[in-house]
Amino acid sequence: MLATSRRVLVSILAVGAVLAPAMPAQASSPAPTPIGRGDLRPLRPKLPPGPSTLASYTLLAPVSVSPSQLVARAVLKPGTNCPALATTKKVGTQTISRNYPMLERTVGPKARTAFATVKVCSAAIPAGITSASVGGRTVPAAIPANVNRIGIMADTGCRVEPGRIQDCAKAWPLAQISARLAAQKPQVILDPGDYYYRESACPTTDWAKCGANPPVTPVAGMPFKDSSNGWMTDAIKPMSTMFPVAPIAFLRGNHEACDRAGNGFFLFLDPRPTTASTCEPVAVGAHPVPASPAVTDTWAFAFSVAPGRRLKVAMVDSAYGTDDKVTNWVPTQNKAYKQAAAVTTKQAGWESWLMTHRPIFGRQAGNGFAPNFTPWVSNDQAAASRNLLGNYQMILSSHIHLMQAVQIKGQPPNLVVGNGGTMLDANTTYPIPNFGPLAKNTGQPIDPQYPPYPKASSIWTKVAFGFGIATAAASKNSWNFSMQGPGGNVFGTCALVNPTGTAPNLGCK
């Protein structure tokens, strides 16, 4: 049986090589090409996952990258060839089978020492595909005709840093959350960021909590915290139960800044073909330094919710900036929010969500007594997005490690889902502050250039591990949210209601 499977596999790859033109090794995915009569051939038998394929998954992507808005990615053992993206397509009564080449994706040369234990391959998924697999593993092949069930999770990695060691072995629920979310059968999954928390070597005294095989530790000589071993342990393996279920939109968080885990984020999770080396260190004398802070371009994807109803999600990079004050980062960040506003111009029949890691309206723990204290997060984002939020029915964020919904009159509500597995924030009360975002405790502006927002009309907070499921309501612009724990218990429900399309309200209980 094994010999037969090998002969079938060799035959498949040989046919794929004839049908697909040879392409140079580069980081970009090939443009999909039409399937012609010469591509007709019998449907191949399904093969077991290849032993060299460690993971395969589908990323949501901008249409400029893939007309289907989907990119297939594979993580392999080093020293192996990129597999083919194997697809089928229905044409009338016939099933057409075709292989597409996947191309290697690499971090910049100065970061490669830290990522030598894997090989990553990528390919745009052509539009109209019925099924797809990589290395024998099924991956989502198409966005459903109507998407009315969305999974949401974020802030997932296991925290390992001096003074704060999470029990990764027994009390880190990411794998359980991923499996439970997958069982809910979402049609797409949204993840606003923060995947990598193992930023220090596990102390020998805490090996029972955070030890890993192979060990996860920053690589000597690298001016950043992550590695391929770390990404496999902290994200790829525990999330893998979700991969066959739905395409995922990944956005980087502050933990994926270039001096932390940015190299791995752009290698594994960013869908764009030109971003893999975004965080390559810069040579300064004998020692490399992290790439300078920068905001990557805003991008968006869209899908149908129901006939006459479509949703667009704008993806804004907020990995950098400051939470508790307004800084000179605001003009740089402002460009990303302007780009998002431009791609979500209001149209009849369209709804828009803004997805950005740092909340624009988020309530952190504590009340503070110092005049300059503010309980609001993140003030750089609130300032940078000022007067640019009118297109959205909702803002989706994470960053603070809890689940929260904040409503401010005249603004889209901010849903925070930052409870996907990393160490939670304080389990205390989160009352409505006396003043709105961009205000000090005294009510005065944090920065005179940016007037404070009104006092919040409602804040709902739950400090518990879990995820969210958004289900489209019958009315346009309206969604229902179920907030669930790792075991499937529902600990909160929310309703996003916006009957006129101009006054969204998110009520939770």
What are these regions (language model features)?
Residues 146-251, 256-257:
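Conserved, compact domain cores that house catalytic/ligand-binding motifs in diverse enzymes
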Residues 158-167, 198, 258, 322-325, ...:
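Short, solvent-exposed loop/turn elements at domain surfaces
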Residues 1-12:
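Bacterial N-terminal signal peptides that target proteins for export
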Residues 74, 155, 189, 194, ...:
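Divalent metal-coordination and catalytic microenvironments
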Residues 147-165, 310-321, 353-357, 412-419:
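Active-site-proximal beta-strand elements of phosphoester/diester hydrolases
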Residues 133, 208-342, 346, 370-375, ...:
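Extended active-site neighborhood of metal-dependent phosphoesterases/phosphodiesterases
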Residues 192, 196, 344-365:
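Short acidic, glycine-rich surface-loop motifs adjacent to enzyme active sites
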Residues 10, 20-164, 174, 179-185, ...:
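Acidic, histidine-bearing metal-coordination/catalytic regions of metal-dependent phosphoesterases
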